């Protein structure tokens, strides 16, 4: 058996030598590992018990982050002539790394080469190793010397931050011993540690020199007894027990057990005196106190582990019969070594950074590798691939045309005699800007055959020729020749040609071919549907661009938008080349700084927003290269660089780049690559952070959190994102998405790694719109949530804990939402796909979905999208929209045609506003139909949306303009040209301002979508229409309330002061109303009634049209944006057509002015003042009169003519100036057929009836005008005179009709028209002579004279009116027109003209020239050419004047007794007039019959009582305010 055992040992040793080599076998048997020790001293023989070379002694640092190892080497008595001692440190215990370290000979200390007696070393890494190396061919030490037994090595584990008293004491002892040995030379005894301060004498520590010797040749393990030796100050629970000395075991107990040295010690107090060795041995197994109650130690327990270093424990009990306590420990432990070695499994190192793309253009490959630490002692090898590849595609390379191989030589052209042979080659098509092939494509050579025989024979068939057509069926042919026919003359039998059909596919129709197009400075040639056309990229980019010709749903070919996925801007390409230049520097810091500069440049480029789709892929590639460079160079970017990185990502993920991403991802899924780059960058940043440090990065589209957390410090769950964090962007703060990371997940994969040094890097990212740019899913599946990412490095251990994720839905109406995570192991190219494995949906509702996932990844919510939600553009509007818009436009066009035909009669502000309103509605209807057909054309759709927005708002604004015009008419505001321009600014200017502002802010983003040509419903752009429209409706309601309140005010009097003074009147100013409507003269009451009627019509129109308009456009918006619902289209058709008919009904059929104008149009009425219009308007064209200007014009032409001598001229002249009328005012004609034109003022008066007062002969001064009311009976007799000035009755004869007494009738006068004939004075005097000949001869006077009335013929040569000097130069030639602003002079001339028919006696008896002079002087300073600016002032003057003359008529008519006594009329009362026979063109006017007279009779004002209204003619009543 012994022989067998020896044989097995020999075989096993031989096997080890063969497998591992001799040196490896030596390393296996002479390696020592020491760990769990805080202090120790060793000799060379203890460290290297075997006499082999390359033996090692390794010391492990308990925690490199907390402790440092100090090593003392005493060379004084050691001879290093036969070997070398190497000292070095490393982090990972790997034989390959140690060999690599020895090969580089970097940071290795040669201890034997030191010139000093002591060598002090400090190490901060995980392992310290000392290696003994013999020279080559040295047999080794044969025996051990005495110096091998001495302690030459001492080490100490010392706390970095707060060293212990024990540690500092040991360091100071080393220093003191060095100083003593070197005789005070301090330069060779340097220990660089500033935390300890050594005392001048060691006794100050309380430890004597004798006790220090006891620490030599001992080892202090790290246990409960020595725990206090590592702390600065001892706590109550810590001890530094050195009360007993444990000597090393004897030689027979000391040996090697595996690769660990067994060392034992007995703690000893540093205060204890040295005792003899025999006493110590005697007391070794006795109780420290010497009491009999302490039992002996038990046997050592078995080793705690079966392989590697373990521990053994022994205990004892205390039995104290006398109630005293036992002293000393009751439990001891020691290190035990086991001969069995623990297997070490193979471990993969970190992946190397991705290499650059193997090609600069075209499809290349990126590679990364990793190395495996080989297993030891039977461990498992590494599992998984060593190399990882992935594709990369930067840009397409230009491909030159290449000649293919030559074809084989054809057969000889003849089968006999000499002929030729041909061969050809083909050229592959050049692509992406490559050059064509160069050189010939065919070659020929001679062939030699035997001479031809006598009989003809067919040769072989040739190749088929090319097809004659490329489509719709062509023909191809092949031939063969007959050999020997020339010699023998006999033809071969059969045919020498064959034909067959080819290319029978159908040719595309003309409408299936995209025509040649010029777009973006590129010409796109004709291309059939389904094919691609290629072009060179623009000048600022390289590569090729493509454009597809597709078929629409109706089978018509159309060009799609060009694809720029293969175009890369020159700036991006230069930036990519600069990365290679930085990498070529070869220095870590320079490369890292260069990458930071690259990110700054890339940030500037991405912020310009003018890049191509290919630039997005290039940007992702640049970010990947930057990240890999940071990782390869172990470079930690600064905070600015990190912020720039995430800002670049945010710029790339902007929603504006959605179409570019869709274009780019047809070539390569760059968005998925971008997610992986961000995760790698997060861990690079996290590894450079301090413990417990976190960083929040917030941008417009990305929110990221990076935290570095020790495993032991994670006490609570982690929530992301943090809503209340300062500076959080709004979209993330308002987001309802969150993820809860449980604390239990922070557990390493290996349980041995779980200690205080385990640190995790946690990264979490929330993307705002990454779902928009990810590749489109199939089967109508969409991403219905934001995307959130959670990643942790190193990878935590799989536990039963779940990540709780809650995501909000982005779109409503989706079906079957479920949770997914991104799994990158399900595709061949390592890109990944969405997977449901590892995630389960626990709760879902209409707006949220809650998930529980058992792994870290990228999470989202997928849902099914109903197919009917996808809206396809039909190309033509629906029939319902066409019918509704057509009916509305037809009604409004009809209204416009009617107004155009009657424009000369109904032209006014209200009519102009209506025409503009109709124009806006018609334009809106047309644009609605156009927008339904142009959804595929981006530019036309955007333009249509902008104009539709404008006309929608304009329709609302014109309704508001109509309400404003009504309000100004009711309140009496003056409407000048400036006001009318403000109407246009409100109707067209305000909508244009709103649309221009909206387009400017949005840059047309949202004006038109892929499905409809209207404002986008997303982003709040719709408020640009709803807001202004709602404001217009609100203001319109306010104006309507004000107008209605004004219309229902008391008595219709506008001025409150006049209303108070007027008192109670039955019919105020009714006596001023002529019953003859032909004259066109109305009273103030009639004017107010007309204004109120128009205002009420406008108010009623607003109340009906405005709600209908709002309903119409609301239904139009719904019909345009939701084409699936036919209900909205029907509602729009109903409301739109109803709106058109309502507008026609309100503004055409029911409008009184239109009715009157239409009747006049049917009777072919003409304007009698057309020939005279040029005199009124110097510019030769008419101007629209405002409602108030019409009122004033009527008032000025219908003022009561009071024939009271001098009072009349002064009073009326000062009162009836043509105030606030424009110079180019248009006067409208009177309908001779009897139509009422109360609303069309300024008509030429065809007939005027004047009732001559009875008291004309009665003298009356201005003082008498202010007398109180006279008795009624004093004014019963009146003489009436009817004056007709109709120009059509020029041939009328003069006839005096007997007077007919009419009681209580008022006297009236009508202002003359535009001209009067005045006879200029022959002498330049200050007086004006007015005679009968100055009267206009067109007039025919009919007087109804009372028989008692005595009228004497006037003598005109004695009738002189002494006017002031300022009236003298205002004489006119005959037939010269007066200016409208000279109405005062016109009126004076008319008054003098009428006075020419009075008798001399009446003139002399009734007119007091001195009184006239006095009154004229009072008004000489008045400036009657100034303009009044308020209608309130005008109405006040007009009403006050009429009230004064009404009062005068009632109280001044006192019968003259002298005149009544002589009732005989003068014999020659009308001698002054010429014979009517001299005017043959006149016709005689018949006496008015009873009906006509009733129609023309005057209605006097019947006052209820006498008014105490003084006739005040002070200047203050008639002064105008300028």
Curated annotation (Swiss-Prot):
Q: Mind naming one GO cellular-component term on file for this protein?
A: membrane
Provide this UniProt record's keywords sorted from A to Z.
Answer: Cell membrane, Disulfide bond, G-protein coupled receptor, Glycoprotein, Membrane, Phosphoprotein, Receptor, Repeat, Signal, Transducer, Transmembrane, Transmembrane helix
Q: Which SUPFAM superfamilies match?
A: TSP-1 type 1 repeat
Provide the leader sequence positions.
1-24
Q: Tell me where in or outside the cell this protein is found.
A: Cell membrane
Q: Which residues lie on this side of the membrane: Extracellular?
A: 25-880, 932-939, 1003-1023, 1120-1125
Q: In which tissues is it expressed?
A: Strongly expressed in brain. Also detected in heart. Reduced expression in some glioblastoma cell lines.
Family to which the UniProt record says this protein belongs: Belongs to the G-protein coupled receptor 2 family. Adhesion G-protein coupled receptor (ADGR) subfamily.
Q: What does this protein do?
A: Receptor that plays a role in the regulation of synaptogenesis and dendritic spine formation at least partly via interaction with ELMO1 and RAC1 activity. Promotes myoblast fusion through ELMO/DOCK1.
Q: What is this protein called?
A: Adhesion G protein-coupled receptor B3
Species this chain originates from: Homo sapiens (Human)
